[in-house]
Amino acid sequence: MAAKDVKFGDSARKRMVAGVNILADAVKVTLGPKGRNVVLEKSFGAPTVTKDGVSVAKEIELKDKFENMGAQMVKEVASQANETAGDGTTTATVLAQSIVNEGIKAVTAGMNPMDLKRGIDKGTAEAVKAIREMAKPCDDSRMIAQVGTISANGDETIGKIIADAMEKVGKEGVITVEEGRGLEDELDVVEGMQFDRGFLSPYFINNQDNMSAELEDPYILLVDKKISNIRELLPVLEAVAKAGKPLQIIAEDIEGEALATLVVNNMRGIVKVNAVKAPGFGDRRKEMLQDIAILTGGTVISEEVGLTLENTTLDDLGTAKRVNVTKENTTIIGGAGAEADISARVEQIRKQIEDSSSDYDKEKLQERVAKLAGGVAVIKVGAGSEVEMKEKKARVEDALHSTRAAVEEGIVAGGGVTLIRAIAALDKVDAINDEQKAGVNILRRAMEAPLRQIVFNAGGESSVVVAKVKEGEGSFGFNAATEQYGDMLEMGILDPAKVTRSSLQAAASVASLIITTEAMVADEPEDDKAGGGMPDMGGMGGMGGMGGMM
């Protein structure tokens, strides 16, 4: 085991704070509408230019192991804020830096770190309560666009496209961000339920213009097994042919004579039919088939529950206004399922999302909710170069997280104003000794830091602006983009309450850990014994002795 280097007390904290400051100083220059760019070196290709705090934080690794520990802990602040609300990473970093620096000063002056931590924790709880009370619901398209614009560093086109996407697919709909092919941003909206399975045979195509199979007002047969024997399907096919409607089959697989017979029937016009594989795999496939059944008002034919294809009637089939199948995707539009059943299914999946600990599972469950409840929108980001594309895509994703957070917990005045207003709530804190009071005061100063940094980045005088904002009430604040004072909500400078709240909570939680650190352990740096070159190999004797081995 390698030898360890151990540092205690002030010398440990000093090195740690140095690391905190290096990372925070690099991140905080990006804060606000006049935030500066940070250029990140890449191992190949052009460097990345970004104004996204979390991208900057991720890149930073320091040579000194003790300083690096401090930097990594502040990185954790950005990650926590990003995970909870998807934005507010730079604000959280600025808050954490201020709490750490003020807290370490107090500890060095001889105060008890644990009481300081208790004071900070009590203050945070009161401030969070105040932020929640200040929140206003965010339900109209204009507000959503403004939140998106602010989060995308003032890019109005991004705010507008996100607001359009949310309007079209609803609050529950899935919105994904992809790299586009042109210079302009585009929005594609898929109504109804779409899954990534295409037709099993090109002979099902009936619309040559867009190479798709379109069925109007079809019956939908859902089967949880492979179909290879056509005899099993005959009763259903005959019943559907009599009804004079098309049939969409969604099964685990359809092969051999079953598929061949369906193709022949379709081409001869006996029954208009199309077949696709069921989406997903294993248990997820069963769940998704059940989702489609509920959406279309049908039943999944599964031998596990005693249902067989031979005994299937028209009552077991689902229906929809239209089914559109391309080579890669199937879209079911206007499923005839009962609203109450769909709502109950959505609630059930939401419960699973709450109980799930895996991010991947949560994402897949959220997609299922969207497919049942709203629809899917794809924002295709346009840009002039790859460097710009990466930077813009990161901003669009940030803005999307922000708008979701705004819809969830409401909005508050942006530009650091809400934190300034929440300072008043710290007077309610029940601090039982001077050290806890000092902890509350550390938080009081830290909550001014984001506004100070926004003003500093805009080239203004921080102290003057903070004093003026404190004199005002409600959402009165400083618009750094225009350098004017006024009502932040009216000027459209909004932040999601969830982002402001989670920034403060993440910063206080990690900063408290740093303040209460008393010892640090790291690997001793290893000496390079070989001196950089290869050791002497004794000339290898000219290899002449190898002749006898032939």
Curated annotation (Swiss-Prot):
One GO term describing the cellular component: cytoplasm
Molecular-function annotations in GO: ATP binding; ATP-dependent protein folding chaperone; isomerase activity; unfolded protein binding
Family of the protein in this entry: Belongs to the chaperonin (HSP60) family.
Catalytic activity: ATP + H2O + a folded polypeptide = ADP + phosphate + an unfolded polypeptide
Matches recorded under InterPro entries: Chaperonin_Cpn60_CS, Cpn60/GroEL, Cpn60/GroEL/TCP-1, GroEL-like_apical_dom_sf, GROEL-like_equatorial_sf, TCP-1-like_intermed_sf
Keyword Oxidoreductase appears in the UniProt entry: no
Summary of subunit composition and partner proteins: Forms a cylinder of 14 subunits composed of two heptameric rings stacked back-to-back. Interacts with the co-chaperonin GroES.
Protein source organism: Marinobacter nauticus (strain ATCC 700491 / DSM 11845 / VT8)
One Pfam family from the record: Cpn60_TCP1
Residue numbers binding ATP: 30-33, 51, 87-91, 415, 479-481, 495
Main location: cytoplasm
Name assigned to this protein: Chaperonin GroEL
Gene Ontology annotations of biological process type: protein refolding
CDD domains: GroEL (cd03344)
UniProt xrefs under NCBIfam families: GroEL, PRK00013.1, PRK12849.1, PRK12850.1, PRK12851.1
Subcellular location: Cytoplasm
Enzyme type, top EC level: isomerase
Known function: Together with its co-chaperonin GroES, plays an essential role in assisting protein folding. The GroEL-GroES system forms a nano-cage that allows encapsulation of the non-native substrate proteins and provides a physical environment optimized to promote and accelerate protein folding.
Source organism, top-level taxon: Bacteria
Keywords, alphabetical: ATP-binding, Chaperone, Cytoplasm, Isomerase, Nucleotide-binding
